[in-house]
UniProtKB/Swiss-Prot annotation:
Coiled coil: none annotated. The lineage of its organism: Bacteria, Pseudomonadati, Pseudomonadota, Alphaproteobacteria, Hyphomicrobiales. It comes from Bradyrhizobium sp. (strain ORS 278). It is a multi-pass membrane protein. This is Undecaprenyl-diphosphatase. It catalyses: di-trans,octa-cis-undecaprenyl diphosphate + H2O = di-trans,octa-cis-undecaprenyl phosphate + phosphate + H(+). The gene is uppP.
Amino acid sequence: MMSDTLRAVLLGIVEGVTEFLPVSSTGHLLLAERFFGLGEDGFWKSFAILIQLGAILAIVALYFFKLSRVAIGALTNPDDRRFIIGVLIAFLPAVIIGLIAGKYIKALLFDPWVVCFSLIVGGAILLWVDQIDLKPREHDATRYPLMMYLWIGVAQCLAMIPGVSRSGSTIVAAMLLGGDKRSAAEFSFFLAIPTMVGAFVYDFYKSRAEMTSDHLGLIAIGFVVSFITAMIVVKAFLGYVTRHGFVLFAWWRVIVGTLGLIALALGK
């Protein structure tokens, strides 16, 4: 029988690998939880959200100097101030939709069947966007037009449906709006910071009374594993998509979604 410590390590790896790839970390974690037999266990559902902070801190570490430059530059540089405003504008739609409909979305859509269908549909869209002849106009994620930030934020709301992928929806939106592949991926990383920190704080507050010392130890393990894994994956991901695009990730989504549907149909 699998120990809780091993589950925490494996889920931390799944989170770290999938969080910033356009494959849906939430979808993969839900399928992994089902595979591990965690069912409706409230702690493990919260665990999947809480360990996202490890992946987020990996982005902060990797982009520390760039983010610090922007933060300091915002005092005197209007372009840096504008970027910070742009991130907040992109973050706002998710806050509004999350507060209004978050609990209904979780109740109605957090289902393995929804995850699998979303993985397949999202994979087809990602494949289409990667193949069409887009003409990038924007090559610096910190200098996108303000309306572009807003529409990327609106697209991020689609990721509240498990299996859609937060990074996938924001990357696709940025590319359709004129961003190149690298800057689209980078802005998706930057937008993840306020979005996922907000989700972490909200879920930790809701589940704080149920946490035990054993739970905190498991969360710490998942946190560290997701941090290390995300550090490795993000550096490799940027170089890969710049050279090869998103075809690999699109097909991965389609294959995982299809296998998931087959397993569900067979009652696995």
